[in-house]
């Protein structure tokens, strides 16, 4: 058995904490964050809250669900340009920068297609 496993994975299996948890259970040492860190950071809203609590600057953001996805931007207090992204995904999959309302609503629907939490995050584009 190896002394340590060098983690060089990309995508959900390497980012969501499941492989790290398996290694933890098997007593296999590895590089990178532990399973809890990976799991927490996969959820962008949880990550934003951790940043805020610890004084790390982060743009304001809100989430939309499939029930609230058609709420007009002015009712949400957000204005273009915006970033739309799945709440729980990695590798920049489903992340869009939107300059028009058409791009925004298209991005919302596309981001829901790749999210597994029924939440999409919107933030000002900075």
What are these regions (language model features)?
Residues 99-126:
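Phosphate-binding site of ATP-dependent enzymes
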Residues 1-24:
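N-terminal glycine-rich "phosphate-gripper" loop used for MgATP/nucleotide binding
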Residues 13-16, 92, 96:
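Gly/Ser/Thr-rich beta-alpha loop segments that engage phosphate groups in nucleotides
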Residues 20, 24-94:
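A conserved helix-loop-beta module that forms one wall/lid of the active-site cleft
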Residues 5-8, 31-33, 60, 97, ...:
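Short catalytic-loop micro-motif centered on adjacent basic/acidic residues
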Residues 13, 41-45, 98, 102:
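Short, amphipathic alpha-helical segments
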Residues 11-13, 64-69, 126:
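Short beta->alpha connector loops
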């Amino acid at each position: 058995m190896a002394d340590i496993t060098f983690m060089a994975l990309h995508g959900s299996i390497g980012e969501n904490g499941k492989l790290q948890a398996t290694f933890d259970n098997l007593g296999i040492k590895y590089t990178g964050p532990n399973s809890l860190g990976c799991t927490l950071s996969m959820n962008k809203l949880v990550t934003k809250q951790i940043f805020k609590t610890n004084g790390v600057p982060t743009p304001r953001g809100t989430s939309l669900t499939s029930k609230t996805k058609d709420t007009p931007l002015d009712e949400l207090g957000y204005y273009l340009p915006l970033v739309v992204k799945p709440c729980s995904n990695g590798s920049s999959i489903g992340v869009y920068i939107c300059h028009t309302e058409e791009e925004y609503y298209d991005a919302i629907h596309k981001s829901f297609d790749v999210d597994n939490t029924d939440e999409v995050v919107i933030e000002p584009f900075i």
